[in-house]
Amino acid sequence: MTKRLMTKRRAHNSVPLPRATRRDFLKHSALLAGAGVWYVSSPPVLALPEQSLNERLNVACIGIGGKGDGDSSQVARHANVVAICDVDDKRLDAKMAQEVKGIGQPFEKAGRYNDFRKMFDELGKSIDAVTITVPDHMHALATMMAINLGKHVYTQKPMTHDVWEARQLRLAAKQKGIASQMGNQGTASPKFREGVEVIQSGMLGSVKEVHIWTNRPIWPQAPKIMSRPPEQPVPPYLHWDQWLGGAPERPYNAAYHPFKWRGFWDFGCGALGDMGCHTANLPFMALKLGYPSSIEAEAGDLNSETCPSWARVRYEFPARGEMPPVKVNWYEGRKDGTLVHPPAELVEQVLSEYAKVPHDEKDKKSKKPDADKTPKLNNSGSIIVGEKGMLYSPHDYGGVWYLLPAEQFHDYKAPPQTLARNPKGD
């Protein structure tokens, strides 16, 4: 068992809140969760007050930087934001004064916290639901605490830092009877859902091969960083002990915060964990993929501190009902300075057909082939290869795609709708 998991499993009895250290964080996290932060306690579900359809929920937002800024502003359009929590005081200052179009300054009267344990201590009874948008290593700790207090949770992707954590959250959510969702914005796109329906309708025939790639990492990791960064002074606006949370203790370095923690094993999940949930979302949902029967991987610049500089991973999935076995290939990073991509022959075939797609059908985010230029593969996307055709998505989120060969699908008509749509995009 790794040191990281051991620290997350540890339970204590005393709770010294006033002066927060990392050790105190673990102690108090365990107590708030019940018998232990990772063990689902036996008391019945905490009942929430009955609310009418017109009554607004009281929501607390844990993490308000980056994606958390958008999540908190979005939820403020539909609920009362009663508390905001972040380890970065500069973010809190900006959020308290922020104006959201159409609703003014929804955060100016919200409770302000650096430590979500204290937030739950002081406002727990007035909180109905929580958004959690923090570094990966803290997803499970914050989410489990909220669940065990009977709060509904919206946790950003990836759901957790490892598989074991995800399984524990699933058990806790089921026992507590709360509503939960992982933030994965592409899933709400109408075009994404139509793509799922296209594949499941059989329009492409049986799918036996999928290729998914990303230009990530776009943050520093191997080969640039392959050992522990040296200690640096902690900025006065950053609460470093709270940022570390349940991770193994280490000194601060600007290499971690903000955003760049993704490439460190103790905090992030690398390119696959960061973008796989987006770029692989369409094929995984459409093909109803579960557990793979085998996984093969190769990667470069391996080390114990940071994620690899590049990788290729092949998953083999068994048949699912009438769907045949399928091989899913993942590509990330740069090898010898070149982005790792699907096989050249497949790429050439896809781009040749993509060039035939009428110009006005191409999305602004995709690379439109000019008359005198050869089209290039987008930096991220997916290719779903079926017996009757292919779906090419030059897009991170699967919300843009084209059916190839272009001539074969010239008169394309959408299949019957089987998935709900969100016309407002909320």
Where do the protein language model's features map onto the residues?
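N-terminal glycine-/serine-/threonine-rich beta1-alpha1-beta2 phosphate-ribose binding loop
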Residues: 2-152, 167-179
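Short, solvent-exposed loop/turn and secondary-structure capping segments
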Residues: 70-75, 94-97, 140-145, 165-166, ...
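Extracellular/periplasmic catalytic domains that process cell-envelope and extracellular macromolecules
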Residues: 52-54, 76, 106, 123-125, ...
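Structural recognition of the beta-strand scaffold that forms the well-ordered cores
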Residues: 58-62, 82-86, 131-132, 154-155, ...
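Alpha-helix capping and helix-loop boundary segments enriched in small/acidic/polar residues
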Residues: 91, 107, 133-137, 157-164, ...
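Contiguous beta-strand/loop segments that form the cofactor/metal-binding neighborhood of enzyme cores
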Residues: 194, 206, 211-217, 221-269, ...
